[in-house]
Amino acid sequence: MTATDTWSPEQPIVSIRNIRKSFGALEVLKGINMDIMKGEVICIIGPSGSGKSTLIRCINALNDIQEGSIKVEGMEVHRPDLDKLELRKKIGMVFQQYNLFPHKTALENIMMAPVLVMKENKTEVEERARALLKKVRLDGKENAYPGELSGGQQQRVAIARSLAMQPDVMLFDEVTAALDPETVKEVLLTIKELAADGMTCILVTHEMGFAREVADHIYFTDRGVIVEHGTPDTFFDNAQDERTKLFLSQIL
């Protein structure tokens, strides 16, 4: 029996139970619980240092946890014998920094992991990579190097690179934070289109208007706990906790 034999699409695609994470003596996640269904768009917001980026890095096993459980399609992410390659096929992640290889073209950057890591057929991967560049509205930029692209274009190549592994869940960690204001919109549009196609997306973001428009559910974190969560309308128009109200009053 494989780790995913007991999972079905009617169950949460990501299930987080009572996770705790510390860096030395500092506990940054203090018993987080969350269920995310297939096709949902989840936005995690909160002040700096609230644990939101650490949380999604734990989902992808980039950070370990001290207690609790994270399952993706029934696969226990933090079990000792985890096949990281299997996990990387299930979960894609895009960071604030694009981390593209500067001496590789946009097309080559997208193709690298499927060809070199997954040993997929190069011709088939190239066809998929070209389709992904078109999907993120960068057709015609196949042979461009990262230095020839704007920040927003590089971030869209990074998104296409993650999609090339054909994941079921996409994680976005403040992907617009390092971008010039005029390029933020094009990246958010790409994520919005992914969500419309049914991709399960978990985003850490400071883009409140985007969160309100696209999210199915919003989680507000502060000091390592989920303070409040709800639908966008409920969250923004009828917040209950004083910490949530204070945070929203400072950014809206």
Functional labels for PLM-detected ranges:
Residues T2, D222-R223, V227-L252:
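C-terminal boundary and immediately downstream tail of ABC-type ATPase nucleotide-binding domains
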Residues P9-P232:
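ABC family nucleotide-binding domain
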